[in-house]
A protein has these predicted regions:
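Extracellular glycan-binding segments that recognize GlcNAc-based cell-wall polysaccharides
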Residues: 1-123
Length: 123
């Protein structure tokens, strides 16, 4: 959004300028990754959704908000570099794929599986 629109939103919400942060990347995948980075390493739960269509991400946003986990974006048959990098940094205990195999392929699921934190046996 434009700076003017951000200012209008800030004003309408009654927020001070130090309470509003802009998160941006070179594309929607990098923007989602930049936002996810604010969650920090060891985030217990993360979600991935298709980046070219919003219904699955929107449907999963309630769960993400409840669990405090970020939603990262993927393509139908590939994982953007920004998403891979951030998943490696987050190392979530659980990773939920929002969407069917018709939306997010098994190739993508297999590619993101290694980013799930390994189980640590109890002593």
């Amino acid at each position: 959004i434009s700076a003017a629109m951000a200012s209008q939103i800030q004003s309408a919400a009654g927020l001070a300028s130090n309470k509003v942060s802009r998160v941006a990347g070179s594309d929607r995948y990098a923007t989602a990754a930049a936002l996810a980075a604010s969650f920090g390493t060891g985030t217990p739960t993360a979600y991935v959704a298709l980046g070219t269509n919003f219904p699955d991400a929107m449907a999963g946003s309630a769960a993400a908000g409840f669990t405090g986990g970020p939603i990262l974006l993927v393509q139908t048959d590939s994982v953007p570099a920004a998403t891979s990098t951030e998943l490696a940094d987050l190392a979530p205990d659980e990773l939920f794929v929002l969407g069917s195999t018709g939306v997010i392929s098994d190739t993508v699921v297999n590619a993101i599986s290694p980013f799930i934190a390994p189980d640590v046996p109890e002593p």
